[in-house]
UniProtKB/Swiss-Prot annotation:
It catalyses: L-glutamyl-tRNA(Gln) + L-glutamine + ATP + H2O = L-glutaminyl-tRNA(Gln) + L-glutamate + ADP + phosphate + H(+); L-aspartyl-tRNA(Asn) + L-glutamine + ATP + H2O = L-asparaginyl-tRNA(Asn) + L-glutamate + ADP + phosphate + 2 H(+). The lineage of its organism: Bacteria, Pseudomonadati, Campylobacterota, Epsilonproteobacteria, Campylobacterales. This is Aspartyl/glutamyl-tRNA(Asn/Gln) amidotransferase subunit C. Allows the formation of correctly charged Asn-tRNA(Asn) or Gln-tRNA(Gln) through the transamidation of misacylated Asp-tRNA(Asn) or Glu-tRNA(Gln) in organisms which lack either or both of asparaginyl-tRNA or glutaminyl-tRNA synthetases. The reaction takes place in the presence of glutamine and ATP through an activated phospho-Asp-tRNA(Asn) or phospho-Glu-tRNA(Gln). It comes from Sulfurimonas denitrificans (strain ATCC 33889 / DSM 1251) (Thiomicrospira denitrificans (strain ATCC 33889 / DSM 1251)). Keywords: ATP-binding, Ligase, Nucleotide-binding, Protein biosynthesis. It is an enzyme of class 6 (ligase). Its EC number is 6.3.5.-.
Amino acid sequence: MQVDDVLLSRLEKLSFLKISEDKREEIVSQLSEIVNFVENLSLLDTQNVDEKFAMSNDSTFLREDTAFCDTSINESILKNAPLSSDNFFVVPKIIE
């Protein structure tokens, strides 16, 4: 895939981003490198690689979920809100 200014303009439009003129050449270059890297990955022969292959035989260790709530952080955030209730932001209803 060729990354050029036309493609960058299309990506810019699709992502609702505005890229300044002085950064366009640099971004085209970076995107080209990324695309070339991915194209190189697609050339790898993985025909004989087991689908469940992993670099380590160790299983993923799970940690116990523990709820933690630092109320001082909540208070410092919510004190800047125009309106809050029960540790939540209160916002105007926008859907009928």
